[in-house]
C-alpha cells in the first residue's frame, strides 16, 4: 500500500497554507492523493461576535495569549476528521525539539499529524499539557507565528513520501539526507563567464562522477557545517576523499 499522509492544521490564518496546497511539490502530492491537508480556524469556535481567540496573560506582561476553548474546539474537529488514523498533535514552538532531516524522517513514518500554529505570545500552557504530543522548532529565532514553521515541516515531510518527487532518487540526494551537505550542481551552458563545468561531470564515467560528488559533499560540509561531521562516522573511502579535498584546497 502506498504511503499517504493526512495533515490537519489549526491556525487563525488558514489562507496562508494555500502556499503549499496550491504550489510546488506539496500541491502535486495533494493532487496525487499522497497528501491530505485541511485547516481549522480557532475563530470558528468562539462565542463572541468579535471571534476573540486571545486574552491578556495572568501575571501581566506584554502581548496576548491564545485561549484554550477555541483551540480545543478546532482540535476536536481535526481529530474527528482524521477518522481512524492515529494523529500525533504537534505544537510549533521555539521551545521544541529542533527539526532536522532525521526528525523529518521520523515524522514521515506517521500516518496523520495535527499541527498547532500559535500566534501572539503563545498559547495557554494547559492546552499544551493536555493535548500536545510533541513540540518542534525550526530554529533559534523569532517568527510572528507557527504557520511558516508548520509549512516548512509539511514540505520537508512530503518530500519523503514515495512518489511525491519527480525522480525516485531526488530525496535521497538532498542535503542532510545522509548527514552531509549537497554537492555543487551544474547545467548548460558548459562555459559561463569563463567558468567551466568540472570535466568529470562531462566524462560519462558514473563511478568517477559518484566519487567527485561524494568528495564535494564531504568538503563542503567540512567547510560550512563541520559540526555535522562530528556526529557522522566516515567510511574509509570518505576519509580518503575528504583528506584529498583538504590537501587540494591547501595547495591551491
Swiss-Prot record:
For this UniProt record, the keywords arranged alphabetically read as follows: Cytoplasm, Methyltransferase, S-adenosyl-L-methionine, Transferase, tRNA processing
Fetch the InterPro entries from UniProt. Alpha/beta_knot_MTases, tRNA_m1G_MeTrfase_C_sf, tRNA_m1G_MeTrfase_TrmD, tRNA_m1G_MTases_N, tRNA_MeTrfase_TRMD/TRM10
Which compartments does it reside in?
Cytoplasm
GO biological process terms on file: tRNA N1-guanine methylation
Q: List its EC numbers.
A: 2.1.1.228
What is a GO molecular function of this protein?
Answer: tRNA (guanine(37)-N1)-methyltransferase activity
* Reaction equations catalysed: guanosine(37) in tRNA + S-adenosyl-L-methionine = N(1)-methylguanosine(37) in tRNA + S-adenosyl-L-homocysteine + H(+)
Q: Name one GO cellular component term.
A: cytosol
- Return the CDD domains for the record: TrmD-like (cd18080)
User: What is the enzyme's class at the highest EC level?
Assistant: transferase
Residues binding S-adenosyl-L-methionine: 118, 138-143
Q: Which family does it belong to?
A: Belongs to the RNA methyltransferase TrmD family.
Record-linked PANTHER family: TRNA (GUANINE-N(1)-)-METHYLTRANSFERASE
Function comment: Specifically methylates guanosine-37 in various tRNAs.
Q: What interactions and quaternary structure are annotated?
A: Homodimer.
| NCBIfam families from the UniProt entry | PRK00026.1, trmD
Protein name, UniProt field: tRNA (guanine-N(1)-)-methyltransferase
Amino acid at each position: 500500500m502506498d504511503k499517504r499522509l493526512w495533515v490537519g492544521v489549526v491556525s487563525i490564518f488558514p489562507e496562508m497554507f494555500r502556499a503549499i496546497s496550491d504550489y510546488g511539490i506539496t500541491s502535486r502530492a495533494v493532487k496525487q492523493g499522497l497528501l491530505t491537508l485541511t485547516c481549522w480556524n480557532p475563530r470558528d469556535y468562539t462565542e463572541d461576535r468579535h471571534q476573540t481567540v486571545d486574552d491578556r496573560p495572568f501575571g501581566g506582561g506584554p502581548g496576548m495569549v491564545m485561549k484554550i476553548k477555541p483551540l480545543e474546539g478546532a482540535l476536536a474537529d481535526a481529530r474527528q476528521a482524521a477518522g481512524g488514523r492515529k494523529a500525533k498533535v504537534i505544537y510549533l514552538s521555539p521551545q521544541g525539539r529542533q527539526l532536522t532531516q532525521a526528525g523529518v524522517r521520523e515524522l514521515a513514518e506517521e500516518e496523520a499529524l495535527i499541527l498547532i500554529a500559535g500566534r501572539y505570545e503563545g498559547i495557554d500552557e494547559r492546552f499544551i499539557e493536555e493535548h500536545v504530543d510533541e513540540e518542534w522548532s525550526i530554529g533559534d529565532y523569532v517568527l510572528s507565528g507557527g504557520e511558516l514553521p508548520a509549512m516548512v515541516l509539511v514540505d520537508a515531510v512530503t518530500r519523503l513520501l514515495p512518489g511525491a518527487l519527480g525522480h525516485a532518487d531526488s530525496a535521497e540526494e538532498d542535503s542532510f539526507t545522509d548527514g552531509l551537505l549537497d554537492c555543487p550542481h551544474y547545467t548548460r551552458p558548459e562555459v559561463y563567464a569563463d567558468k567551466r563545468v568540472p570535466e568529470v561531470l562531462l566524462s560519462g564515467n558514473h563511478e568517477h562522477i559518484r566519487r567527485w560528488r561524494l568528495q564535494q559533499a564531504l568538503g563542503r560540509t567540512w567547510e560550512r557545517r563541520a559540526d555535522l561531521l562530528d556526529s557522522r562516522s566516515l567510511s574509509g573511502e570518505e576519509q580518503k576523499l575528504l583528506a584529498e579535498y583538504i590537501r587540494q584546497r591547501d595547495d591551491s
